[in-house]
Regions:
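AAA+ ATPase "lid" subdomain C-terminal helix
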Residues: 277-308
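N-terminal accessory segments that target, anchor, or regulate ATP-driven/P-loop NTPase machines
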Residues: 1-57
């Protein structure tokens, strides 16, 4: 229904009710029926039925990620090497078939916030020449029973359909904050997101590694200890990769990446700055460079000096 049609209907209904009351009709049953009908239609539309907008469509179509490679991610050499080794199982399909190796279904990235887990998932899609589909765990949590499970099915279906449409042999499905839906299940207590987790487990068990397009699940969390044991067992998330805070060499690498588009003066020592930022994550180091540029602009300086960054 168009916007004008809805406005006309909203204006017409009260006038009709007033007219019926004026004629002496009892409009209470009519109003009650209308409220019940509206409630049913609203619930069905929220669950994607009756031609309503589906949950995945309300969230918006997944967009291709920006160009991202492992070289664009500063530091994390150990984590990147572990991830590349796992991704080779997706690329070298003929070799792993020859040796009877069971390909991976899932990779779990763990570590503190801001260490580049999402960036590594995007780089994985580029490394394997795969379609990239992403979602956050919070998108699956709803007050309506069954909505989360439906969204899980839609997500897997979208990954496969997009890979087929774009002519790709594989798809990388990234779920951030998986602890929201993958938390430990408590006996006796039934929660809506228990159904969502059960559906995720069912979909992962249904991944046939010989099928095309092949599907790889990458999930990220900073609370690994909260995850249900059924989710992290072998055969589902086979590889657990720790993405930890960068060391000094990694911090300097990250600072160099984020300083490429900034006019640094010759006095700036990124090595010194890397030593001063012990315990900083990649996101915090990016913020340091950004704040330094803001201070330089505030001082109306031509370049960013060491004092703006320290």
């Amino acid at each position: 229904m168009s916007k004008i049609g809805k406005e006309l209907l909203v204006g017409f209904v009260p006038v009709l009710l007033v007219f019926l009351v004026f004629l002496g009709f009892n409009v209470f049953p009519l109003v009650l029926s209308g409220v019940i009908l509206f409630s049913l239609v609203y619930v069905m539309r929220m669950r994607g039925g009756m031609g309503g907008v589906t949950s995945s469509e309300r969230k918006g179509k997944s967009k291709p990620p920006e160009y991202m490679t492992f070289d664009d991610i500063g530091g994390q050499d150990r984590a990147k090497n572990e991830l590349k080794e796992a991704l080779d199982f997706l690329i070298r399909h003929d070799e792993i078939t020859k040796f009877g190796i069971r390909p991976l279904k899932g990779i779990l990235l763990t570590g503190p916030p801001g260490t580049g887990k999402t960036l590594m998932a995007k780089a994985s899609a580029h490394y394997t020449n795969s379609v990239f589909v992403s979602a956050s765990g919070s998108e699956f949590v709803e007050m309506y029973v069954g909505v989360g499970a439906s969204r899980v099915r839609d997500l897997f279906k979208e990954a496969r359909s997009r890979a087929a449409k774009e002519g790709k042999e594989s798809a990388v499905l990234f779920i951030d904050e998986i602890d929201v839906i993958g938390g430990k299940r408590e006996g006796g207590q039934h929660r809506e997101y228990d159904q969502t987790l059960n559906q995720l487990l069912t979909e992962m068990d249904g991944i046939h590694t010989s099928a095309s397009p092949r599907l790889l699940i990458i999930a990220a969390t900073n609370r690994k200890e909260m995850l249900d044991s059924a989710l992290v067992r072998p055969g589902r998330f086979d590889r657990h990769i720790e993405v930890d805070l960068p060391d000094k060499k990694g911090r300097e690498h990250i600072l160099r990446i984020h300083s490429k588009n900034k006019p640094l003066s010759g006095e700036v020592s990124l090595d010194q700055l890397a030593g001063e930022t012990f315990g900083f994550s990649g996101a915090q180091l990016e913020s340091v460079m950004n704040e330094g540029a803001i201070y330089a602009m505030r001082d109306q300086a031509e370049q960013i000096g060491q004092g703006h960054l320290s």
